[in-house]
């Protein structure tokens, strides 16, 4: 966070963040034998703006992010490398409602635009021209979860020097859970990719489309284990219901430390 302030009845927070990622995919041939691997090392830098209406709780998040990709596809005695840039812009809003003292329902709406541009590359077999691709997404859903006070109490340790720090039983830890079902619509998906060899007439162009609708379910749990340390886990599943057939799973573990 770079700035936190109050403006016209609203809480404003803005800042920057960085991230590094690595993915590795094993590729199989038609007969199930190993064909090779695809790896992607990525570094991201982004900025965010968060606005919260003090009286109603209505909030909005604006995010812009750029990512540098370094990709490598490897097979027996053959390597293919490509570098490029990805970008993402997101606008998300939500309005929380209290169902009970510690249970909250929050309708959410999000718009995302993302794109990817990779350099052309080649290996011993031929060449690939990736071109530029982009897609837009609208997500509508809600978040249902607990809204317990996450303040870290003094605990019940018999040793005074440990109260408020290390000696808290599991039942004393501040914990919140949540589930988030959503419908995601992808549209304006575009991007061509062509490949071929040195032989005349070998060039082929593919125009994959990601347009369609999918259902997404996310669930998570977070617990404050120290005054300044929060642990969290999250898992999700997405399945397309129209357009191209696809499904996916995701999982995430987080460690937040404040100082």
Task: Report the location of each language-model feature.
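Extracellular/periplasm-exposed beta-strand and loop segments of Gram-negative cell-envelope proteins
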Residues: 23-40, 68-87, 114-142, 187-198, ...
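Outer membrane beta-barrel transmembrane domains
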Residues: 43-46, 131-259
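Sec/Tat-exported extracytoplasmic proteins
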Residues: 95, 115-117, 148
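Internal active-site segments that recognize and position negatively charged phosphoryl groups
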Residues: 108-114
């Amino acid at each position: 966070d770079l700035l936190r302030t109050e403006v016209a009845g609203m809480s404003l927070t803005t800042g920057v963040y960085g991230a590094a990622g690595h993915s590795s995919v094993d590729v199989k041939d038609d007969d199930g034998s190993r064909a090779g691997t695809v790896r992607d090392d990525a570094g991201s830098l982004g900025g965010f703006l968060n606005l919260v209406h003090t009286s109603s709780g209505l909030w909005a998040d604006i995010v812009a992010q750029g990512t540098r990709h370094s990709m490598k596809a490897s097979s027996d005695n053959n390597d293919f490398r490509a570098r490029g840039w990805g970008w993402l812009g997101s606008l998300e809003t939500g309005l929380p409602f209290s169902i009970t003292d510690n249970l909250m329902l929050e309708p959410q709406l999000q718009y995302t635009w993302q794109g990817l541009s990779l350099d052309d590359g080649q290996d011993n077999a031929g060449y690939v021209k990736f071109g530029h691709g982009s897609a837009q997404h609208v997500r509508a859903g809600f978040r249902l979860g607990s809204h317990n006070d996450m303040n870290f109490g003094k605990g019940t340790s018999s040793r005074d020097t440990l109260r408020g720090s290390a000696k808290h039983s599991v039942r004393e830890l501040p914990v919140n859970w949540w589930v988030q079902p959503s419908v995601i619509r992808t549209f304006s998906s575009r991007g061509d990719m062509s490949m071929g060899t040195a032989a005349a007439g070998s060039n082929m162009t593919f125009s994959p489309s990601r347009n369609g609708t999918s259902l997404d379910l996310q669930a998570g749990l977070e617990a404050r284990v120290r005054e300044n340390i929060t642990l969290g886990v999250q898992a999700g599943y997405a399945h397309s219901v129209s357009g191209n057939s696809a499904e996916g799973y995701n999982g995430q573990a987080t460690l937040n430390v404040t100082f």
